[in-house]
Design a protein with these regions (language model features):
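Interdomain hinge/linker at the junction between the two RecA-like core domains of SF2 helicases
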Residues: 3-71, 214, 219-220
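Conserved RecA-like ASCE P-loop NTPase motor core of nucleic-acid helicases/translocases
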Residues: 8-13, 75-84, 192-193
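Conserved strand-helix element at the start of the C-terminal RecA-like helicase core
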Residues: 70-94
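Catalytic core segments in nucleotide and nucleic-acid processing enzymes
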Residues: 85, 104-107, 114-115, 139-143, ...
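Long, largely alpha-helical accessory region at the distal end of helicase-like NTP-driven motors
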Residues: 86, 183-307, 313-314, 529-532
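Conserved RecA-like P-loop NTPase helicase motor core
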Residues: 110-199, 449-450, 484
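Residue-level signature for tetratricopeptide repeat
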Residues: 286-287, 317-327
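Interdomain/boundary linker segments immediately adjacent to catalytic/signaling cores
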Residues: 337-340, 344-398
Length: 532
């Protein structure tokens, strides 16, 4: 596309998605791997990253939002970046100003002119916004960003451990936290809230995708949170505010500490192979678009043969291979798609050839299962962050796929064999657990049902009945099973009936379960996970 251009120069402190340079703009991987840098300047500006939940667990998302929405502003601006309208609504209900497509220019202009009244909330805009100096001295980075396109969201759901996906998420986060520091002398306190975002920034598995500068700022944030924990005389929110005040009053101790730590940054020398993979993806797609199907197939096959990734991601590329194969052989394409689906059940299910695999507790031990789950994590901190993020997703109002994934994870945490039949074979209940003596727990999840709903509808009762019939067909009428519907109301509509005994889990009971799991995890804090 750009072959006729002799030189293209792009200038940016960060990029939201540098994979587009290779796949979209057709840049050479070498150019993206080796950007022009000012070697004399390791960092610019001052970002005080604060993770309130690390200061004290009770200093959670809702507490931060509530306190800062109530703040009266006169000397500087406070801005919150949120990923969705749902997140935005919480701020609106507390009196915040929402910057919409229609008024965002006006609201940002007010901040730059020094007109401060209330916190300003910006929805899903992580780039293209400058908030220098007093226009934003406190930036709240609220929750993990979403991808904009359905294709990107599908890829994220299908390949959650993908280096490509996690690198793009990290770049989007970096774009966001850079909004409040726009120059060498600029400074801003950045509050990181939302358990999924905190986990992504702290976890060993994903922290590595940030730039060395951001990783160092996260390390500084963890360090000051640890130091702040020692202050037992003040409430957690006051401790957080005192940290921010140190930066705002230009405390010399803080400035020296920040500068000395940032000066120790060492640039990454490890070379990522991800850009070479992007080049191969682009080449295969180009062949396919040009009708060179055999070349597309062989190009994608070479890419797959050289992969060193988990099964979920390998399945993703097999699905691409199936797509390329379809014009030349439908039968072979379906065969490849079966292989892809067996590796990753988040992908498209073939019309035939996929059988349900029953779960059983034979040769299982619940305590050993719990130990195995916990030893996936390097330490208690990693375990705690992961469980917190999972339990946050196990909440009413959360998107169904996230809720059901969280429930599956909770089952594994508690030592059950845990499965999502509806997701994995497109038939059966949302979640199924199997415990000791093959005692099954069947779940139908209605997390997106409004909290004001009065009744369980006839259609919802019918769904539950169908899933109960499916279970009996697979496991027999004498299987030991408890059936649950997770929904905000317990009243069944006049038109509806259940064919089996169904227990209802409402918000209060779900909260009790989550609190008990949190309590269980906290009991493990004094122990090494390897010794449990």
């Amino acid at each position: 596309m750009l072959a006729f251009v002799l030189l293209v120069l792009l200038m940016s402190a960060t990029t939201q998605d540098d994979s587009f340079f290779v796949k979209g703009l057709e840049f050479r991987p070498e150019a993206v791997k080796n950007p022009l840098r000012n070697e004399k300047q390791k960092w610019s500006g001052e970002k005080m990253l604060i993770i309130p939940s690390l200061v004290e667990e009770s200093c959670d998302h809702d507490l931060i939002v509530t306190n800062f929405c109530k703040s009266s502003l006169s000397k500087f601006g406070i801005v919150a970046l949120v990923p969705s309208t749902k997140n935005c609504r919480q701020y609106q209900n507390l009196g915040a100003i929402t910057a919409t497509t229609g008024n965002i220019v006006e609201e940002l202009d007010k901040l730059k002119k020094g007109i401060f009244s209330k916190i300003v909330v910006i929805n899903n805009r992580y780039d293209g916004i400058d908030l220098p100096d007093e226009s934003c001295r406190i930036l709240i980075m609220d929750s993990l960003p979403y991808f904009d396109s359905l294709a990107d969201r599908y890829e994220e759901q299908a390949c959650p451990n993908s280096e490509l996906i996690n690198k793009r998420i990290a770049q989007k986060i970096e774009q966001g936290i850079g909004r409040g520091v726009r120059g060498e002398k600029d400074y801003c306190a950045i509050l990181i809230i939302g358990s999924e975002l905190v986990r992504f920034m702290r976890s060993i598995a994903t922290n590595k995708f940030f730039s060395p500068q951001t990783r160092k700022q996260i390390d500084i944030g963890i360090e000051i949170a640890d130091m702040a924990k020692e202050d037992k005389t003040e409430s957690p929110i006051k401790v957080v505010l005192s940290l921010i005040k140190q930066m705002l009053v230009r405390d010399e101790g803080w400035k020296e500490y920040y500068a000395s730590e940032m000066d120790t940054i060492v640039e990454d020398n490890a070379e990522s192979q991800v850009y070479d993979r992007l080049l191969k993806e682009r080449q295969a797609e180009q062949f396919f678009c040009e009708g060179e199907y055999e070349k597309a197939i062989s190009s994608m096959q070479r890419l797959i043969d050289g992969l060193n990734v988990d099964d979920t991601e390998k399945g993703w590329y097999l699905q691409q291979l199936a797509r390329y194969t379809y014009p030349t052989s439908i039968a072979e394409s379906i065969k490849i798609q079966k292989s892809a689906f067996k590796k990753n059940t988040q992908l498209l299910k073939p019309s035939t050839g996929i059988d349900y695999t029953k779960i059983s507790y034979i040769h299982q031990d619940r305590l050993n299962n719990i130990r195995t789950y916990m030893r996936k994590f390097s330490d208690y901190g990693e375990l705690f962050l992961s469980v917190n993020a999972t339990l946050d997703n196990l909440s009413f109002g959360i998107e169904a796929t996230k809720f059901e994934a969280a429930l599956k994870d909770v089952g594994a945490l508690l030592g059950y064999v845990s499965q999502r039949p509806d997701k994995e074979i497109r038939k059966g209940p949302d979640n199924l657990w199997c415990g000791s003596n093959d005692h099954y727990l069947l779940f139908e999840c209605k997390s997106e049902v409004s909290g004001t709903r009065q009744e369980i509808t006839k259609h919802e009762a019918g769904q539950m009945n169908n899933h109960c019939a499916w279970f009996e067909d697979q496991y027999g009428p004498n299987a030991n099973v408890d059936r649950f519907m997770i929904i905000s109301t317990k009243t069944l509509s006049y038109e509806g009936d259940f064919t089996h005994k169904v227990k209802i889990i409402r918000p209060n009971k779900l909260k009790i379960l989550k609190d008990q799991i949190k309590g269980f995890i906290k009991e493990l804090k004094p122990f090494s996970l390897d010794e449990i």
